[in-house]
A protein has these predicted regions:
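Asp-based, Mg2+/Mn2+-dependent phosphohydrolase catalytic module
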Residues: 1-7, 16, 38-39, 98, ...
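N-terminal helical cap/lid subdomain that shapes the substrate entry/recognition surface
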Residues: 2-107, 120-122
Length: 230
């Protein structure tokens, strides 16, 4: 039986995009610290790398605000907007998502989202609303709001709570990363489906690659893939 399908966000619901993280922080530094751009950008990049290393190695979360604070950068909404505008190309929802989620919901399956992210919920919800899919989720967890990141079992438990499901054996997780998503979900007791299109840098690999229960090339395949498990 499948009560819920929970999705990763970046590289799963949004197609993978490769971008230069150094440029990401230069954009913010130019907006918020024009008198010390190079210094601020380097400090932001170092703080972000520390946050992601903590996520990979200790499965503890961080936030965009903490990155800015560690870099001694004061950024307001206008500065945030410049940063977000730079990254907008990587936030667009795959066109398969809306019909696929609708099919799952019509079958009585609850739909959730669990994203390892430094960014606040409001940013993610703005992007999902822009693409007309925000209201299709029964619950969403962004690790910027909880202590843990994938692959920690508590992150998956939080996602189950968000969609109102108690038994991990009745949940399926869909993601693009073999460590965070596939290993993590299976370690938490879920089935896991892999979307194998992301060019995840080797520096972001974890200690274990999960063996997915299924692999799909397109999100539109998800309803058919989980049908035998129902």
């Amino acid at each position: 039986m499948v009560d819920a399908v929970i999705f990763d966000w970046g590289g799963t619901l949004t197609p993978w995009k490769t971008f230069d993280p150094a440029e990401e922080w230069l954009v913010l530094a130019r907006a918020a610290a024009p008198d010390r751009v190079e210094e601020a950008a380097a400090a932001l990049a170092a703080a972000a790398e520390d946050a992601w290393a903590r996520s990979r190695n200790e499965h503890r979360s961080g936030t965009f605000a903490e990155v800015c604070a560690a870099a001694e950068l004061v950024a307001d909404e206008a500065h945030h907007r410049a940063y977000r505008d730079h990254l907008e190309f990587a936030t667009w929802t795959d066109p398969d998502v809306e019909p696929m989620l609708t099919t799952l919901r019509e079958a009585g399956i609850r739909v959730g989202l669990l994203s390892n992210t430094l960014w606040p919920r409001e940013w993610h919800e703005e992007w999902l609303a822009r693409d007309g899919v925000l209201d299709l989720f029964d619950g969403a967890v962004y690790t910027s709001e909880i202590p843990w990141t994938k692959p920690h079992p508590e992150a998956f438990a939080a996602a189950m709570d968000a969609v109102g499901v108690a038994d991990p054996a009745r949940c399926v997780f869909v993601g693009d990363r073999l460590f965070d998503d596939i290993y993590g979900a299976q370690n938490a007791g879920m089935r896991a489906v892999h979307i194998p299109h992301s060019a995840v840098p080797e520096s972001q690999f974890g200690h274990t690659d999960g063996e997915p229960d299924a692999v799909v090339q397109h999100l539109a395949e998800i309803p058919d893939v989980i049908q035998p498990w129902r």
